[in-house]
Amino acid sequence: MIFSSSLLENAVNEFAKLPGIGKKTALRLVLHLIKQDNAEVTQFSDIIAKMRNEIKFCSRCHNISDAALCNICSNPMRKQEMLCVVENIRDVIAIESTQQFNGIYHVLGGIISPLDGIGPEQLTIDALVERVPKEEIEEIIFALSPTIQGDTTIYYISKKLSAHRAPAGPGGQDHPVKITTIARGIAFGGELEYADEMTLAKSISNRIPVENFIISGN
């Protein structure tokens, strides 16, 4: 692609760095911005800068948030005892779009993938294990992409939850934790965020029990 302006070329190259944006799409976006008046372009750039500088991650679930707690964790109408474990923030948005889940989330920040150099220590698995007894979670729903890496992550976390349990101490109370995974309505190897809302909704409604654990209460 040959450009008559280095300013145009630089802008196109920056847009093309975004996921899923090729040079041709980047060019269309930049040319669209050129046609807009200064106020609209300034507003666009200000919104991007404000988002980048002020956006936070929820201290509880690691979802995107405007405050210390996201609007899902801080919502008293959500089922606080039902925890959905997802790979990334895009999966939270996909599941919320189905309007079939009214619990809370835990964002792992990825899945275990040794070939990509991603191990348990790079994810928020330890924080998840700590949340389960502390928040008296009754059901954990794994909503990970149906891949070998996703299944490996489910297996690892399930074993870690089992190993983490401890006999109830004085005043402690054991409670059963139901572990489920979404049904395989999504093709193996596919990614959760690309599933249509109806398929994803059915996968959540028809989730499959994995195993029951007894996690010691505090």
Predicted features along the sequence, with ranges:
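Short Gly/Ser/Thr- and charged-rich N-terminal loops/segments
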Residues: 165-173
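A structural micro-motif
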Residues: 103, 174-177
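Conserved phosphate-handling catalytic cores of large alpha/beta enzymes
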Residues: 176-184, 191-217
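Cys/His-rich Zn2+-binding cysteine-cluster or related metal-binding knuckle/ribbon modules and their
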Residues: 2-9, 30-92
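Extended interfacial segments that mediate partner engagement and assembly in macromolecular machines
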Residues: 26, 75-144
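Conserved phosphate/pyrophosphate-binding and hydrolysis machinery centered on Walker-type P-loop NTPases
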Residues: 19, 38, 51, 63, ...
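Short Gly/Thr/Asp-enriched flexible loops that form oxyanion-binding sites at enzyme active sites
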Residues: 149-162
